[in-house]
Curated annotation (Swiss-Prot):
It comes from Teredinibacter turnerae (strain ATCC 39867 / T7901). Belongs to the bacterial/plant glucose-1-phosphate adenylyltransferase family. It catalyses: alpha-D-glucose 1-phosphate + ATP + H(+) = ADP-alpha-D-glucose + diphosphate. Keywords: ATP-binding, Carbohydrate metabolism, Glycogen biosynthesis, Glycogen metabolism, Nucleotide-binding, Nucleotidyltransferase, Transferase. This is Glucose-1-phosphate adenylyltransferase. Alpha-D-glucose 1-phosphate binds at residues 109, 175, 190-191, 208. Its EC number is 2.7.7.27.
């Protein structure tokens, strides 16, 4: 493999344009995405999911980026304008927002491939040698330069980034691949009920991460052919990739940690349980996702907030947090916070007990509340004395959503308050 830090890779990234698919709702997140697209969802105390693929682009040296939006995009667009508009267009750097605008058809984006097809004129104007198509709703840290080097080294027409996952986890959830000994893709199945087992890893299958590198001319050919096919759903995983495997050089790039030779960190966070768990992993002493790695920072919009504050140390009340992440603007006023994430501007009032919970921005939790294993959506005001997560039958009766694994989602609408911004 070519040295990922070489000037060679720098030239490859300069010849690359990235298009991030950020128009999905994330329906398995239920009410959490009623008012926002999944890529706009908060994650990790201060970030949004879209910040991860964008940061990967910047850190990899890819500075021509388009973000394709569609479903309830207001909060996503606002975040991109505030946090990702600092590039120098005159130097060929930009993050541009590409909403569905019916360029090539009277329809909005009809699928992942159609979304790229409807922006062919923009790609043509930029004339990149390679086009990287990225999913905008996954959490991971990845050097795309290494994948580009692999793509060129193998002479691939298309390279698909992939990761080894347990078969039971992939069934019905991910596109999976069958590969030969050289990682050439022999078969691609979109969300099969019975994924193909890896020969070298029993119990595991090779799942698509939803990231693709195309040679630009090859991409144009496939998109135009797909657009003319009335039977197609215009989706990369369902239509384009299965159709080109036989007669094209399509490769799988395994996303692995070279130091441990194991699968690298990658989370789909597509369900309430997986979203809650991925956040909870971050409060562990040494989580696999290192948000403190200065060599690979996650960039985001920085709000101007005061430091977090913890007050009261009386016999009957003490404001503190343990095994937790607490963001700027938070005040823990005589309450207990354990194994939880508090996003910005959260106020935990006296005598409150908050445990194993993810609290999104601008939340007020009033006195004597008891909350366990919950996701509290932005802008909620938890009334005094409210108990959440300790009696699931009662939670369900009040209109809260309780997952199969016992995580409770609370939104403003469920509390009878105003709809989220």
């Amino acid at each position: 493999m070519l040295d990922p830090n070489s000037r060679y890779v720098s030239r490859l990234t300069r010849d690359t344009m990235a298009l991030i698919l950020a128009g999905g709702r994330g329906s398995r997140l239920h009410e959490l995405t009623d008012w926002r697209a999944k890529p706009a969802l908060h994650f990790g105390g201060k970030f949004r999911i879209i910040d991860f693929p964008l940061s990967n682009c910047v850190n990899s040296g890819i500075r021509r980026v388009g973000v394709l939006t569609q479903y309830k995009a207001h909060s996503l667009i606002r975040h991109l304008v505030r946090g990702w508009s600092h590039f120098k267009k005159e130097l060929g750097e930009y993050v541009e927002i590409l909403p569905a605008s019916q360029r090539y058809s009277p329809n909005w984006y009809q699928g992942t491939a159609d979304a790229i097809y409807q922006n062919l004129d923009i790609i043509l104007d930029e004339a990149p040698k390679y086009v990287m198509v990225l999913s905008g709703d996954h959490v991971y840290q990845m050097d795309y330069g290494s994948m580009l080097a692999y793509h060129v080294e193998t002479g691939a027409d298309l390279t698909v980034s992939c990761i080894e996952v347990p078969i039971e986890e992939a069934a019905g959830a991910f596109g999976v691949m069958t590969v030969d000994d050289n990682n050439r893709i022999l078969r691609f199945d979109e969300k099969p009920k019975h994924p193909t087992e890896l020969n070298d890893m029993p119990g595991m299958t090779l799942a698509s991460m939803g990231n693709y590198i195309f040679n630009t001319e090859f991409l144009f050919e496939q998109l135009r052919a797909d657009a003319e096919n009335p039977e197609s759903e215009h989706d990369f995983g369902k239509n384009i990739i299965p159709a080109i495997i036989k007669n094209s050089n399509v490769r799988a790039y395994r996303f692995r940690d070279h130091e441990t030779d194991r699968a690298s960190y990658w989370r789909d966070v597509g369900t309430l349980d997986s979203f809650w768990l991925a956040n909870m992993e971050l409060v562990e002493p040494s989580p696999q996702l290192n948000l403190y790695n200065q060599d690979w920072p996650i960039w985001t919009y920085q709000t101007h907030l005061p430091p977090a504050k913890f007050v009261f140390d009386d016999d009957d009340r003490r404001g503190y947090a343990v095994d937790s992440m607490v963001s700027g603007g938070c005040i823990v006023s005589g309450g207990k916070v354990s194994k939880s994430l508090l996003f910005s501007d959260v106020h935990v009032h006296s005598y409150t007990d908050l445990e194993e919970s993810v609290v999104l921005p601008n939340v007020q939790i009033h006195r004597h509340a008891k909350i366990k294993r919950a996701i509290i959506d932005s802008g909620c005001e938890i009334p005094e004395g409210m108990v959440i997560g300790h009696d699931h039958e009662h939670d369900t009766a009040r209109g809260f959503r309780v997952t199969k694994k016992g995580v409770v989602l609370v939104t403003r609408e469920m509390l009878g308050q105003l709809t989220p911004k």
